């Protein structure tokens, strides 16, 4: 497992090749996550601070009061309790908008059109697009941001091809193309992260 110095060295080497990189978070330990943030900044790096559901809110306030215009959030995509995760995220966004509405937000593990539109994340990431070749599930894009997933046996009936026989690189390309179409649709419908929230929208964030 990489330690913070190894990760910092990696970011120094490749950081200029990406749009952004996040702090090395320690899930369940907000203090250790904050310490890693400080270490990386002391080394001349500018990682996105990471705030997780369950962390003490004082850490979010510390990040907001610091020189950070872009913050990442974890715990948003909790399939065990989606309602609670969404309520928490709504409170977070409301808090940020009140403090500084120009701060950009990144969501770990989120690709739901509804959540991306509601919270206006500036960016997001997810490994769900890999499910097709990780679990042999054929995904195809139905339009309007909707994906349908079918199992290997059903794929022969639906597409005339047993998906299990498709080479890995073929599954990779298909999944990449499918998810690209989905995200292009979401990009078209999501409000700009620079567009101010109306009061009625803020009131609905935690609902």
Predicted regions and their residues:
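Catalytic beta/alpha-barrel core
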Residues: 1-6, 10, 17-62, 68-85, ...
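Alpha/beta catalytic cores of nucleotide-metabolism and tRNA/nucleoside-modifying enzymes
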Residues: 2-15, 22-25, 31-41, 90-105, ...
